[in-house]
Amino acid sequence: FGGKRSKPYAMPPLVKTPVLSKFETAAKQTGCHPYMIPAAIASEPYTTPDGVTHNPCMYCGFCERFGCEYDAKAEPNNTFIPVAEKTGNCEIRCNANVVEILKKGNKVTGVRYIDTLTLEEFIQPADVVVLSSYVMNNAKLLMVSKIGKQYDPKTGQGTLGRGYCYQITPGATLFFEEPMNLFAGAGALGMCYDDFNADNFDHSDLKFIHGGVISLTQTGKRPIESNATPPGTRAWGSEFKKAAAYNFNRSLGIGAQGASIAYKANYLSLDKTYKDAYGLPLLRMTYNFTDQDRALFDYITKKIEEVAKAMNPKAMASKPSPKDYNIVPYQTTHNTGGTITGKSPEDSVVNSYLQHWDAENLFVVGAGNFPHNGGCNP
């Protein structure tokens, strides 16, 4: 299911652990085609074309939310930033919060930023400005800078903030009797399959479009983060503590990243009441799950349960289908939309080169350029 590549991957996949082999066998038993997830983590010593050396991953388990002490994981601070600084043409200004893009005519002239430590305000002139500050902040900066026409859900006019999409995240937790050394792992160490992603399967009698990738990852369990107990376990007291300790190294999670389609009622805008520390309106997210989301969620959940049962757990628990969106429990931060790319200013914020239609020297870069969220992370 992988797309065509101009050249092979630079290194072999990360190690296939016993847990991943167990998932692979079960997936094949259900007729699917699992493969190791490509990862920006060195599986062996590697020197980049820029001359940056990366050591192999040690599978320490402190990876996906941490810096890498081995320089095995590709991060800005050990890839392009040191290379850029060596040219003498790059300066990194820390604690600088850009609050406005300055525009004159059909070009931007720079940015206004605030030193977050001293609260001093600075004007930085620029020949070219690149927004690369995540989906939400890219949209907010354009809005507070009054660049582009903000989307109005009542009329359908405007493009800025339009097309905000999320993800659906079906999943199941499996409990086993044998310990699995789950403290070891890496941020993208895992196995997945695309048999139920995109149009890789028949949608004739289904009530949704698109699909999602199903995966099992071994990122390194940490006690506070991971505290699964089997269904029926008491939620407090000695029974809970015993079950939590026993199952810490005996539970696995199978999950999916499901597509999210753009709807007129889901969008980003500026809040009319609440402001940030600099007196600017906060970004407001108007969003809820749809029947499309729920139908896809329920279908993928059944497919997850099939592979889960093939792994022969002693118990399992599936995530319930989503009702209304709730921002409190963490679900995903792989959002899209709000600054989508397209063929004209009437239907998009940027062109195919990610240049803003209203300012040729302003580039808006990020997952916000996608008009919907696919069945894997953008």
Could you say what each language-model-derived stretch is?
Residues I37, Y59-C63, V99-K104, N249-S260, ...:
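A glycine-rich dinucleotide-binding beta-alpha-beta segment and adjacent secondary-structure elements
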Residues Y46, K140-L142, G374:
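Short glycine-/acidic-enriched loop or helix-start segments at secondary-structure transitions
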Residues H372-P378:
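A conserved FAD-binding loop/helix module that cradles the flavin
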Residues P49-H54, K103-T109, T332-N335:
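A short, glycine/Asx- and small/polar-enriched loop/turn
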Residues Q157-R284, N288-R294, T332-G337, D347, ...:
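FAD cofactor-binding and catalytic pocket of flavoenzymes
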Residues K86-T87, A96, E100-K104, V111-G187, ...:
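Glycine-rich loop(s) and the adjacent beta-strand/alpha-helix scaffold that form part
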Residues F1-N97, V328-Q331:
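Conserved redox-cofactor binding core of oxidoreductases
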